[in-house]
Amino acid sequence: MSSSVYITVELVIAVLAILGNVLVCWAVWINSNLQNVTNYFVVSLAAADIAVGVLAIPFAITISTGFCAACHGCLFFACFVLVLTQSSIFSLLTITIDRYIAIRIPLRYNGLVTCTRAKGIIAICWVLSFAIGLTPMLGWNNCSQPKGDKNHSESCDEGQVTCLFEDVVPMNYMVYYNFFAFVLVPLLLMLGIYLRIFLAARRQLKQMESQPLPGERTRSTLQKEVHPAKSLAIIVGLFALCCLPLNIINCFTFFCPECDHAPPWLMYLTIILSHGNSVVNPLIYAYRIREFRQTFRKIIRSHILRRRELFKAGGTSARASAAHSPEGEQVSLRLNGHPPGVWANGSALRPEQRPNGYVLGLVSGRSAQRSHGDASLSDVELLSHEHKGTCPESPSLEDPPAHGGAGVS
């Protein structure tokens, strides 16, 4: 694999990672049914994947060129992707523990898992991720080694090094500290927790079949709780498959220095695989989780496809501005310089207000009637929701909301 092919694939992954994970965050923002503690951790994971596309992949491409830089500047580029990897691992671990509590001790879930605690845990995870990933910046690096053929090029000025990952980040840090302590151990812990989740669920289902007890959870309720655990277990498994190959190569490089170094094409492939994991999660949400899938469709139809059609139709430009009032939201449109509230033909625009916060524009005196659950638009329609929802203390996985959503299900 040539460097040009590697760079092209990395750029495609970056774009897909940004778009897909922005869609995840957007879905949680606009759909109150998705605003629960579990999905707060999902948003944290999506934020790390967005940062991979925005920062980590450009940094990796830059390092692959072997440019000349100050050692600590190169070190920051090399270590930042480790910060995001660590944040992803911590997010997956918190999601796993959240699901374990919901299934094993559901009656105590509301008291143990609250929004305030979830936000605090997310903040702690990000602080720890930066501390672990940027540890080489504090001295555990190769910058203090004498400059030789390994980490210095004659083409670089004095005080600069050829910026390559293995030349500035020591392999003992990558293997013992980063991989063994903070990648492998959390992955094994998640594996053990998911095994306990599925074994406990299987045992409870067998008890329900043999001797149903009054007051126990129904079979359908338990299955609704196990289904998201399966989806999240798939995400953890794919994360392990994507990140382990590169770490295994690092182990071979460290424990067998006399062995031949991995060929460039294999290094490129494992790096692409580790970054490609950032694209996978939104696809799993869309395929496995109904509420996410429906919200994705509404976003794409309402904010992408219909807007494109409006801009193409007749060359008429429309600018929409929303003014908030205590009773709800109002919409005023200006078409081709005409004042707000008046169409080009002189007829008045009469926006229909609804108590639930949704606003429906009237086009040419004709009402664009829609049901509450339909997010498709008529000729001109602005769909807005005043109330973004609050984080429910009880997970929607156990008690589905009245609107029929189910968080991560």
From Swiss-Prot:
Alphabetically ordered keywords of this record: Cell membrane, Disulfide bond, G-protein coupled receptor, Glycoprotein, Membrane, Receptor, Transducer, Transmembrane, Transmembrane helix, Ubl conjugation
Pfam families named in the record: 7tm_1 (PF00001)
Subcellular localization: Cell membrane
Residues that bind adenosine: E166, N250, S274, H275
Taxonomic superkingdom: Eukaryota
Gene Ontology BP terms: adenylate cyclase-activating G protein-coupled receptor signaling pathway; regulation of cell communication; regulation of signaling
Annotated GO CC locations: plasma membrane
Family listed: Belongs to the G-protein coupled receptor 1 family.
Identification of the protein by name: Adenosine receptor A2a
Gene: ADORA2A
